[in-house]
């Protein structure tokens, strides 16, 4: 006589739709997503896209789509503000847009070169931590072209619901600081021209 309740329970579970069963799991996954996990996922995605673009043969439009996705994980506007400061704020809108786009392309191109080649194995994520200003630092290691195991410390901050890259330290050297120093040198020699700086950035790109 005890078989009937058990059978009813089994039948009730079987009648649950896949979406009904999946909903609590999806909600749990959403609830479990922390800034640290989002930042780690963003870095992992940058690495994956770099590998796919550098190592796979694909139509140009596919490569461009992946390149644009990689750029979407970089807060180029924030980096450009750090790099150029008041020069960016005082530039005409068209010049601001152009230089931010060029800087975004240049940083993404550098990440592809650093992380995408066959030399860049293994790539290891070592963990994430929040720093005092609320940004997240993600530590990773990868083999560089010269054969040594280098450290990349990624700094990401919240923008909307996402965590976007605002800097990466390569063996302790900041990409953002390097870009700022390079820009300062070029601006001092080109009369302070943002368009000339933009053209110079584009001339240094591998992926065009």
Specify the residue positions occupied by each region the protein language model found.
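Positively charged n-region of N-terminal signal peptides that target proteins for export
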Residues: 1-4
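Solvent-exposed loop/turn segments at secondary-structure junctions
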Residues: 88, 105-106, 130-131, 144, ...
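Short beta-strand edge/turn micro-motifs at domain boundaries
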Residues: 149-178
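Low-complexity, intrinsically disordered terminal/linker segments enriched in charged
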Residues: 170-208
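Early exported N-terminus immediately downstream of N-terminal targeting peptides
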Residues: 24-111
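Bacterial N-terminal signal peptides
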Residues: 7-16
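Surface-exposed, charged secondary-structure patches
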Residues: 101, 109-150, 200, 204-208
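N-terminal signal peptide c-region/cleavage motif recognized by signal peptidases
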Residues: 17-19, 23
